[in-house]
Amino acid sequence: MITTVIEKIFGTKSERDLKKLKPIIEKINSLESEILKLSDEELKQKTFYFKEQLAQGKTLDDILPESFAVVREAARRVIGLRHYDVQLLGGMVLHQGKIAEMRTGEGKTLVATLPSYLNALTGKGVHVVTVNDYLAKRDRNWMGPIHEFLGLSVGYINREMDNEGRQEMYKKDITYVTNNELGFDYLRDNMVVRKEDRVLKKLNYCIVDEVDSILIDEARTPLIISGPAEQSTDKYEVVNRIIPSLKIRKITEDDEIKAKYSGENLSAGYDAVIDEKNHNATLTEDGIAKAEKFLGVANLYNDVESEWVHHINQALRAHHLYEKDVDYVVKDGEVIIVDEFTGRLMPGRRWSDGLHQAVEAKERIKIKEENQTLATITFQNFFKLYSKLSGMTGTAMTEAGEFWQIYKLDVVEVPPNRPSKRVDGADLVYRTEREKYNAIVADIETLWKKGAPVLVGTRSIEKSEKVSAMLRSKGIPHKVLNAKYHEMEAQIISQAGAKGSVTIATNMAGRGTDIVLGGNPATPQQQAEVVELGGLHILGTERHESRRIDNQLRGRAARQGDPGSSRFYISLDDELMRLFANTSRISGILERMGMTEGQVIESRLMSRQIEGAQRMVEGHNFDIRKHLLDYDKVMNQQRTAIYHLRNKILDGESVSEQVMQMIEEVIHETFDKYYNVKHPQSTDFNTLNIFLQRAFTIDANFSGESIKGKSKEQIDGETFEAVKKAFEERSKYFNEQGVNFNEVERMLLLQIIDQAWKQHLYELDQMQKSVSLRGYAQKDPLIEYQKESYNLYQNMLNKVRDVMVEYIFRLQLPPKRRVSPIGTPSSEGGGETSGADTYSNKKIGRNDPCPCGSGKKYKKCCGADL
């Protein structure tokens, strides 16, 4: 209330922020006549002029007005588009490291050329992040010529590109790339064993297109690079056979409310309870007994190693919470996840913790082995690595609080170039889903007969195909855009504004592509006809959990001052209403009002119920993202330290010094463990000598006689000098044999760190699952996680040190083998052999023979602790 009064008097925060930028707009416009007179060559020379200005001490803000004027003119000459004043405002907001909220059709792609050019002048690189490969390529090919005209290099990344191609593209001044490719490239860069294999430069400045989709919607799923775990997949098939025999109860918001007052036990008489709202599945006492009998296990919870309870819970979720053609599709014998916010397929992404395998078992397709995490990071922590971060979207104000709290990003609402003419109709509410879909199809038919273009938004593939089937039965021609037909996404959505077209699209499929009235390209006559019919009509088949996603769907209509309309259709059977609204109360009210079959209702009560349910879900989803971030913050500090250590090793810092420090620490700890300070003569010298000989290959002959008159520190120091000498002799020997010992140390240390980090991630993952139970003991799980993860991290570092010291002294050169150069006959072919002696630097596998020469497998010998 107070905020509203202040805004009426002083204007909104966005209005106040933009008011400060108006003088700069005037300055840019005043330069336009001067810039217009420049020849193409003179305009290109401005880039060199700006770089000289920066070299002489000017700041980016100092050259902003003229640089924006230059980009505006270059865009006009190269692609025939001139930036509006509001687009200049958007460009300045992005340059300030903020989020610009600009409505659909306001030209956000063109806006990004302004700050990307300005910030690329520093030579440190700019990344423009999009949601898919198509948009990255399209935007590079569309906007890239503007930058290239001005002398900057532009590239883009796609998922098929190899390492060399990526390196080349990231060297460009401006690179268009998807959020997933960028994040995975960062993780892969921190797994390489040669610095030449890294692809990214320092993360300087980033512009995130559709910033709400990337930093909010996708933030619930961390990026994970994984490798196969040494576990069998048999249990998934066994457990999958149990599920059909279990009696299931699904509980809703209504059930919980009733049980709260009646004291009813919701699980009584059932084997498992499915909580759709919180996406959980739990076995009851009856279910546990039934599962134990089926598996032949005395106690499910005592058999911790086999994780039967975990497997059963994941199978329950797979069968009752994850729906085919809603949450995933089965394509070419694979389960492919469907992005719940965009409706797009996500090939290559897999649910973790055995859930993906449980879904594969449910669909009776080949179960792929469970993966173990090798590297992981959340989008929250990844994008915070940039020196400056900005973003743009059509819908950000509803999440402004989260953007500030998580990313410290301010949101500024940029006004449209022309006032919106969109008419947003009130929600139409029906009692049942059947009545709702009949009404939707009837309205589509009415609009289609008039020739008005219609875009129907659905939440899932299943619902889009249901509407499609109903339209086919009516003989209404239409196009379907969902994850099954995503290849034609941009083409289908761009024609959604054509006269008489009916397009069905899941969620925000086609986002980033303009819908031009009359079709694309449209003739003036076609455009005028569609304008006369009221423009594009948006019909939403149900409300999304987030108001922001609903606003995105509405925003597809009425771009750049065009006419258009939007309306949502709701039933009490909709997922949002069923799970989060008190539908029994609403249903009772509707019955008392005497609602008949097919009758529609519009009321403030319904609107309040819907908005209340959406706010509840938004709060719930924010808590999930915050929970993920709280735990990842702990890991992030450790990840940063490990990656920093790896980069120091890769970048050529002396590994020998680090190894000598490790050796010294191990020697100190050895004497602390074995040497009896109070009674030196009582020291177990035999054990001490054996350990020193085994660990450091030195002949230690300590005895009560040899240590007389010496302090522990003296003996410690003498031992270190002897070990140091042995180490230097090993180094000399390797080098004499033509093997760079420094490189051996580097490769070895990297492999040990990587193995230890992989194991550490696994232990953190297991520990995070277990600490949640400590809440029952009145302990904060997050604090417990922080304490234990610190201890695990210290143990990991000690393990790296101990294994490195032991390994470096046991490492032996393999027998030399002659290698024939390419093109020369081998000795087996009767010809002479020629070539240099070579040694394999291949990464050691867990099942490979241990290089120390023991004859054992690596995992049973030097790699046993990793």
Curated annotation (Swiss-Prot):
Give the record's GO biological process terms.
Answer: intracellular protein transmembrane transport; protein import; protein targeting; protein transport by the Sec complex
NCBIfam families according to UniProt: PRK09200.1, PRK12904.1, secA
Which residue intervals make up region (Disordered)? 819-858
Gene source species: Elusimicrobium minutum (strain Pei191)
Q: Which UniProt keywords apply?
A: ATP-binding, Cell inner membrane, Cell membrane, Cytoplasm, Membrane, Metal-binding, Nucleotide-binding, Protein transport, Translocase, Translocation, Transport, Zinc
Binding sites annotated in the UniProt record for ATP:
87, 105-109, 514
Q: Does the UniProt entry include the keyword Protein biosynthesis?
A: no
Which cofactors are required for activity? Zn(2+)
The UniProt entry's sequence similarity note says: Belongs to the SecA family.
Tell me, what is one Gene Ontology molecular-function annotation carried by this entry? metal ion binding
Q: Does the keyword Cell membrane apply?
A: yes
Supply the name of the protein: Protein translocase subunit SecA
Q: GO CC terms for this protein?
A: cell envelope Sec protein transport complex; cytosol; plasma membrane
E.C. numbers: 7.4.2.8
> What is the cofactor note?
May bind 1 zinc ion per subunit.
Its localization reads: Cell inner membrane; Cytoplasm
Q: How does it sit in the membrane?
A: Peripheral membrane protein
Q: What does this protein do?
A: Part of the Sec protein translocase complex. Interacts with the SecYEG preprotein conducting channel. Has a central role in coupling the hydrolysis of ATP to the transfer of proteins into and across the cell membrane, serving as an ATP-driven molecular motor driving the stepwise translocation of polypeptide chains across the membrane.
